């Protein structure tokens, strides 16, 4: 607690050194006995209220807002400012509980209400049917690369993977340790700039495959499935890594056996992994499956088998509430399409000064990679953009160039500012 009695750094009182009666009081810098604290502890209040309040959809413009940058990072990524402000207001005292969410027992009634509401709001957002289970897990989407085959098939089960980028490739390689994986299509030879046709002309599915796996949006290369393939096996099902476009648009959950996503790109901070899995697929884990990867263990314990990432789940809940307040995912998708169109138009209308290599039909609404015709200027572009408070525009190390990640929480104003900068930069260097 800061005390305003003096501008001296000695106002931390006894924190500086323990009392020693042998020392000269003048040397230990104790304040006089008649010193009075202007703001005693008993007068500290918290802006949080005992009852739950909706996250405001209007971002408060103040000095803090003006000091914030436009963050185009791929993840962890920008969060809605009004959500951050809501979390700030509840940090010390969550809704009259007298404690922070960070301090709560994960088995207490307070956190139970938080995780239950987060799940309920997510179910509303995605219209998740009752025959699907929602799990809040840890370990990132990368851990699910192992958990999925361990839970959904035997070591001899055939499974198909469509590889449209680095994450799909990593998922297939990891799954090969636990199942008979076939990468039935890969875009690697084309540098992952497209998605195959589903009419059977470009790949052939195994009719016995237990599941078909896709990465719905490849963060690094900026390719996104606009429609989804149907497994050739009538008893098979579709599995999707939706980490980087989760809750960015409506999705028919019933078309999937399992959806998984790391939260840190679109719905929260890093540390939370969300799995949406059809109930009949739970309970068939291979014997070798570690307890922390067993969906049944987590489902039976309502994501509380061990201590979950409580604060991360709380933040996800605030984001879900905010998305609902915006009108749901139909409205969110409209905003995302508008933002992406502004940026892609600027690239396409630059007469080749900027280039996006991805086929237009599958360009991501979330991650926009682009290069400069004069590649030697890319470093200057990134540095000058940072001076204008637009950060994290450097492309992935495996690709180079630039990448603007424009997730749900990136406002249109951020994209418009980037486009204005791009035009100015082009005029200067064309």
UniProtKB/Swiss-Prot annotation:
Annotated GO MF terms: O-phospho-L-serine:2-oxoglutarate aminotransferase activity; pyridoxal phosphate binding
Alphabetical list of Pfam families matching this protein: Aminotran_5 (PF00266)
Residues annotated to bind pyridoxal 5'-phosphate: 141-142, 167, 219, 241, 264, 306-307
EC code(s) of this entry: 2.6.1.52
Record keywords, A-Z: Amino-acid biosynthesis, Aminotransferase, Chloroplast, Plastid, Pyridoxal phosphate, Serine biosynthesis, Transferase, Transit peptide
Catalytic reactions of this protein: O-phospho-L-serine + 2-oxoglutarate = 3-phosphooxypyruvate + L-glutamate; 4-(phosphooxy)-L-threonine + 2-oxoglutarate = (R)-3-hydroxy-2-oxo-4-phosphooxybutanoate + L-glutamate
Highest taxon above the source species: Eukaryota
Keyword set includes S-adenosyl-L-methionine: no
Function: Catalyzes the reversible conversion of 3-phosphohydroxypyruvate to phosphoserine and of 3-hydroxy-2-oxo-4-phosphonooxybutanoate to phosphohydroxythreonine.
Family label: Belongs to the class-V pyridoxal-phosphate-dependent aminotransferase family. SerC subfamily.
Subunit details: Homodimer.
Name of protein: Phosphoserine aminotransferase, chloroplastic
Organism: Spinacia oleracea (Spinach)
Upper taxonomic lineage: Eukaryota, Viridiplantae, Streptophyta, Embryophyta, Tracheophyta
